[in-house]
């Protein structure tokens, strides 16, 4: 049986793995086996955190809306219910942006929602 030299193929695969873990510390960015383990862990974390980011932003929007709505003596759940019943097509992201950037517009949205029901 002839000898198979895998230098080019193996080097290409190793370099691809080492490129993924370029910012890691110590052996995780220099040696292939620890780098491969680190790359798998990194990809798993990034997959998990993409979904986590959506959850975190929703929490942030709810907190901002709640803080603004409390100034008008209305609870968060009541405000969302009123806005949905008045058929306003505003999601939590838009409401949070309006609450932070333009408080008077948010006030008019809330009063319109209260008086339309």
Swiss-Prot record:
GO molecular function, one term: rRNA binding
GO BP field: ribosomal large subunit assembly; translation
Keywords: Chloroplast, Plastid, Ribonucleoprotein, Ribosomal protein, RNA-binding, rRNA-binding
A Pfam family per the record: Ribosomal_L20
Localisation: Plastid, Chloroplast
Family: Belongs to the bacterial ribosomal protein bL20 family.
Protein's UniProt name: Large ribosomal subunit protein bL20c
Species per Swiss-Prot/TrEMBL record: Zygnema circumcarinatum
The keyword Cell membrane is assigned to this record: no
InterPro entries, per the entry: Ribosomal_bL20, RIBOSOMAL_L20_CS, Ribosomal_protein_bL20_C
Physiological role: Binds directly to 23S ribosomal RNA and is necessary for the in vitro assembly process of the 50S ribosomal subunit. It is not involved in the protein synthesizing functions of that subunit.
Superkingdom to which the source organism belongs: Eukaryota
GO annotations of cellular component type: chloroplast; ribonucleoprotein complex; ribosome
